[in-house]
Amino acid sequence: KGFDVMYDKLTLQPYFIHGPDPSVKPKTAKTLEYAFNDYQTTKLMIISHPDDELIFGGVELIKHGPEYKVICLTNNSNNIRKSEFKSVMEKLNIGSWEMLNYEDTLHPTQKFNLQDIITYKNWDKIVTHNPIGEYGHPQHKLAFDAVKKETNNFYVFSKSNEKLEQDYLDYKVELLRLYKSEQPVINQIKTKNGSWFKSNSDTNYIEYESIT
């Protein structure tokens, strides 16, 4: 994929002498894997669950999909959700994507470790959940905390005062239908009628998505 790999004579760690960013020197097997898979991606989106990328950042990915690496922190062992996520990534022509296998829970006991993926190269843009977890989800808050631990230079999901342009909204809704297993939750987010939904806003993230 356009790289020549050399090895540091003292540490035996691999690094690249040719490529878009020759200053990148992966220090672990994982960052070496990232460097090979992600040399064309310049933007990073980190989400807690499959469908978060569409609900909160769908239009961003519709516009800039090939530039993004998308990291989903949970559900790698859930074959249904993994398959749905893969379908969405392919439809959006995402440059690179990965699912990790942290537990999907409303009562998390394990923090996310994102040091490798955030720090191995200089991302043009990093996007993740906001500090209140959008509607209060604990794992969304943890994702924000994990990103903030590694960098202060990032964007978060937010809501615009204006509804999305209709063409983008129509395509976003079409893509959301690929998450068949999550339709009840997606509908609750749109109508804000779930007992777990912590929001006094008249708007919802699906129709009023923004990144700030």
Regions found by a protein language model. Give the residues of each.
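Active-site beta-strand->loop->alpha-helix modules in alpha/beta enzyme cores, enriched
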Residues: 1-152
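The feature marks non-catalytic terminal segments
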Residues: 4-8, 153-212
